Amino acid sequence: RDFQFHTDQIINHGYLSVDFFFMLSGFVIGYAYDDRWEKMNLWNFCKRRLVRLQPMVVMGMLLGGILFYFQGSEIFPNLAQTPVWKMLLVMTVGFTLLPVPVSLDVRGWSEMHPLNGPAWSLFFEYVANILYAMLIRKFTSRWLAVLVFLAGCALIHQCYTQGNNIGGWTLDAEQCRVGLTRLMFPFFGGLLLFRLCKPGRIRHGFWWCS
């Protein structure tokens, strides 16, 4: 039955892609910035990340606001009674990627970004970027490996005790714990992979990847 449920999903699938996204982000951060800190300060790093990520955030929230009242469904119980001013407030806050409290839930799913649900992962992406820039970039590969090991243990414990690895999109203590646990191992594991693996060249790599 569960198998049939998942095979019937054409678009809404690939749940673990979020965790892969975190690992890929960690690898890319290491590739793009690990060797630049002698010529770059914290403010330069933040500007680069904002320029890269924030336009996508604003566009996602804007589209979510425009299409908000067209997604009427019984799975979104709060949508019909949400006034326009409240939706606009949530959209405006969403432009900054700051999470909204449960009191501003406009869909009924207690999301920190109800106009663009997946944006919770970008919020944690920013958290990881800040941790990297302020502290973890200074770790040696050995200490980074220790951090990744501990984060992996925390992730295993969460999966074992919770029974799954679902959560991270609500602004409360429990969901933030789940989100941070989901973030730490793959993101800094990706950074560690970059530091341990020497980049190589593949002939005609562009065409193979295409």
Labelled PLM ranges:
Residues 1-35, 51-58, 181:
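Functionally critical transmembrane alpha-helices in membrane proteins and complexes, commonly lining
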Residues 5-12, 78-82, 170-179:
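Non-cytosolic membrane-interface motifs at loop->transmembrane helix junctions
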Residues 6, 53-126, 154-163:
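Membrane-interface helix-loop-helix regions
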Residues 17-34, 121-137, 146-205, 210:
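Specific transmembrane alpha-helix
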Residues 29-49, 72-80:
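Membrane-helix interface linkers and caps
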Residues 42-47, 88, 116, 127, ...:
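Alpha-helical membrane-protein architecture signal
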Residues 43-53, 79-88, 204-210:
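Interfacial transmembrane-helix boundary/kink motif in multi-pass membrane proteins
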Residues 44-45, 53, 121, 144-146:
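Alpha-helical transmembrane segments and their helix-entry boundary regions
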